[in-house]
Amino acid sequence: MKYDVIVLGSGPGGYVTAIRASQLGFKVAVIEKENLGGVCLNWGCIPTKALLKSAQVFDYLKHASDYGLSVSSFDKDFTAVVGRSRGIADGMSKGVQFLMKKNKIDVIDGFGKVKPGKKIDVTAADGKVTEYTADNIIIATGARSRELPNLPQDGVKVIGYRKAMTLEKQPKSMIAPPPFFTGSVNQCRNSGEQPISLGPRCPSIMTTFRIVPKDFSSLTICHILA
C-alpha cells in the first residue's frame, strides 16, 4: 500500500507528527509494534508521574497536621497504587488511538524495517510480512533500555524499567543507575526532588567524569583540585 507519509513509531514525536501531516492533507499511516503512545505514555513520563502523585498524597497524609487536618488512620496499598498508574497509562494510550481515528490515520500493527526505495517491511505478530511504500518516511522509534555489562536483568534482583513499573510487591530498597531514574521515580522520588517516601530506600548512582554541572564543562578535575 502507498502513503504520502509513514511514521515509524507512535510516541509523542511520532503521533503528533502524524496528526499534523494528516491535517495538512497527507495520507498518513503510523507503524507501532506495541501500544500507541510509545514509552512515554505507557512506561515512562505518564505512569511514573502517576506513581509519584500517589507517593505525594501519602506524604501529605503523614504531615496532615501541618495543614491543620486530623487524619486518624491511613495506609498504602501498593497493588492499588501500581494499578492506578497502569490504568492511567492505558487511558492515555486509548486517547492516542482515538486521535488516530479522528484524524483518519491508519495504524499498522507490527515491527517496521526501513528498506531502500522508501519502503518499509512490517512484520505482524503472526509473522506475516507486508510491504508499504511512502513518499516520506519519518523515523520516530525512540530508544530502548540497555542492560549493564556483566549484569543481565534476571527479573528478580536486577530488573528493567518495565518490570519496575509493574512490581506486585514493594521492594524494601532499590538502586537506580543513570542516565534515567525511572526505577527510583516510580517508587519514591524524582531526580532532583526531595524524597517522597512510599517506603523503600532509593540511593542513586551517578557515573560521570565531572563533579560539576554540564554548564561548567570547561572545568576539569585538574581545575577543581588546583
Functional labels for PLM-detected ranges:
Residues 14:
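N-terminal Rossmann-fold NAD(P) dinucleotide-binding loop
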Residues 6, 41, 49, 134, ...:
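Hydrophobic residues within membrane-embedded alpha helices
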Residues 182-184, 188-191, 195-222, 226:
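Low-acidity, Ser/Thr- and Arg-rich intrinsically disordered low-complexity segments
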Residues 8-9, 31, 139, 177:
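Conserved N-terminal Rossmann-fold NAD(P)-binding element of oxidoreductases
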Residues 2-3, 19-26, 31-171:
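Glycine-rich flavin
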Residues 161, 173-180, 189:
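Short, compositionally biased segments
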Residues 1-11, 172-176:
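Beta1/beta-strand and adjacent pyrophosphate-binding region of the FAD-binding site
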